[in-house]
Amino acid sequence: MKIISMSMDSWIQRAALMLLGLVIVAPFFGWTASIVGYAEPLENAAKMTGATDAAMNLNPGVLPDYTVGGFSGPIGTLISAGVGTVLTLIVAFGAGRLLES
């Protein structure tokens, strides 16, 4: 049982490092998307059909457009990526604990 535990710890460490790496490069992807003029396809379709004019924004979300108020684009994206990763891990570990019991 000890061998399984050690390999699980190693797997978790590798996964955590991979997630940390993705969080760190997230602002780069946001920056390159703005450079090439990328826009979400659903937003493009809404603009083409005129749906954005009639839309009401009732709840912009916790981190709208992957930004954090008061921070510049890349820094806000980095914070948003970190928050999203942590929340996802909390939900995943919680679900894992429920499935184990």
Swiss-Prot record:
The chain crosses the membrane at residues 75-95. It comes from the Archaea. Disulfide bonds: none annotated. Keywords: Cell membrane, Membrane, Signal, Transmembrane, Transmembrane helix, Transport. GO terms for cellular component: plasma membrane. It is a single-pass membrane protein. The keyword Protein biosynthesis does not apply. InterPro entries: PDGLE_dom. May be involved in metal transport. This is Putative metal transport protein HQ_3622A. It comes from Haloquadratum walsbyi (strain DSM 16790 / HBSQ001).
